[in-house]
C-alpha cells in the first residue's frame, strides 16, 4: 500500500509491470472518493543485504511410505 501524495489517504495498487529485471512500475489509485488520484510509482532493487551462497542439492528425505521422489 502506498499513500496518496495529494491527500495522504491509502492508495491501492491497480496493476504493475516490470520495466527491467530490477525495476517495477506500479499504478496506484487513491481510495479517498473526494480525491481518486491515479499515479505511478517505481520500485527497484538498490542493494543486497545478504546474497545466497552456492547451493548444493541434496537427496530428499524418504516419504513415510518408504519411497523417494525421483526428480534428482
UniProtKB/Swiss-Prot annotation:
Reading the lineage from the top rank, the first entry is Viruses
Note the InterPro entries from the entry. Answer: Znf_Ogr/Delta
The record's keywords, sorted A to Z, are:
Activator, Late protein, Transcription, Transcription regulation
Q: Does the keyword Lyase apply?
A: no
Q: Which cysteines are joined by disulfide bonds?
A: none
The protein's role, per its UniProt record: This protein may act as an activator of P2 late transcription through an interaction with the alpha-subunit of the host RNA polymerase.
Can you name this protein?
A: Late control protein ogr
Specify the species.
Escherichia phage P2 (Bacteriophage P2)
